[in-house]
């Protein structure tokens, strides 16, 4: 039995930063620490942080006044920030810096009162937070996730139009949508840099490499993780048996019948411990008759600093 491990896989710099912000805040201030939305979309991570004193909330009014509040890696709207400030909360922002970059861009479009097309999933926290950077977005900001939706757009001024994208989309699918948008709106203003993040792109490239080598692919990630779902879609479209799993406990023995080569990757919010647990499960299942191969991919050196307040407290 051969196991092929995709590289890079698992935590990206933004996820790593967000988790460290929560952990450091708990260490410095003591529990409880409140977190608005899941800090990252992974069950294992969220449950681990709950055990050490994190309380995850969906409403700012559920946070006691003057408590410590952390915004998730997906970012929040300006209205949420305003509400948190009204409650005199001590705020630490774990928004991924690459999401913050998109926020800055849409704020610029808002100042110009430009119309905006956002490519992304309407109900995803990142999109909700991004739309919330635009003042009075009604009839100004349009969210689409397919080429078919472009023809339904009612753009008033194609010469004063921007587009942005969610950071965790399929690179291939998004490029097709962008091509179609630019064909219909040739004067649309592009982001200064592409919005899909390096980690999303690298993990999609790495899964394409192992697809060619395996009979079955396990994508480790939670069902509400956008980037993990995109990895699953890529694998599934290839025709290979593909499974999105949170842990090794979800693996059914019947999936492994007649399988000689197994591929494993993990979404950007899934910790390496879950990968190793899957590998260990397979070792036991195949009675240690297993060869493990690391499939080379892009080397990631990006690191994001945690807020200065937390760094100063640690010192």
Swiss-Prot record:
Pathway: Isoprenoid biosynthesis; dimethylallyl diphosphate biosynthesis; dimethylallyl diphosphate from (2E)-4-hydroxy-3-methylbutenyl diphosphate: step 1/1; Isoprenoid biosynthesis; isopentenyl diphosphate biosynthesis via DXP pathway; isopentenyl diphosphate from 1-deoxy-D-xylulose 5-phosphate: step 6/6
Active site annotation, chain numbering: 126
Cofactor(s) the record lists: [4Fe-4S] cluster
Known catalytic reactions: isopentenyl diphosphate + 2 oxidized [2Fe-2S]-[ferredoxin] + H2O = (2E)-4-hydroxy-3-methylbut-2-enyl diphosphate + 2 reduced [2Fe-2S]-[ferredoxin] + 2 H(+); dimethylallyl diphosphate + 2 oxidized [2Fe-2S]-[ferredoxin] + H2O = (2E)-4-hydroxy-3-methylbut-2-enyl diphosphate + 2 reduced [2Fe-2S]-[ferredoxin] + 2 H(+)
UniProt keyword annotations, A-Z: 4Fe-4S, Iron, Iron-sulfur, Isoprene biosynthesis, Metal-binding, Oxidoreductase
Record-listed (2E)-4-hydroxy-3-methylbut-2-enyl diphosphate binding positions: 41, 74, 124, 167, 225-227, 269
Key word Magnesium present: no
Residues engaged in binding [4Fe-4S] cluster: 12, 96, 197
Cofactor binding mode and count: Binds 1 [4Fe-4S] cluster per subunit.
GO BP terms: dimethylallyl diphosphate biosynthetic process; isopentenyl diphosphate biosynthetic process, methylerythritol 4-phosphate pathway; terpenoid biosynthetic process
Residues where isopentenyl diphosphate binds: 41, 74, 124, 225-227, 269
EC number: 1.17.7.4
HAMAP family per record: IspH
Similarity section: Belongs to the IspH family.
PANTHER family: 4-HYDROXY-3-METHYLBUT-2-ENYL DIPHOSPHATE REDUCTASE (PTHR30426:SF0)
Known role: Catalyzes the conversion of 1-hydroxy-2-methyl-2-(E)-butenyl 4-diphosphate (HMBPP) into a mixture of isopentenyl diphosphate (IPP) and dimethylallyl diphosphate (DMAPP). Acts in the terminal step of the DOXP/MEP pathway for isoprenoid precursor biosynthesis.
Subunit structure: Homodimer.
Protein name: 4-hydroxy-3-methylbut-2-enyl diphosphate reductase
Organism: Wigglesworthia glossinidia brevipalpis
Lineage of producing organism: Bacteria, Pseudomonadati, Pseudomonadota, Gammaproteobacteria, Enterobacterales
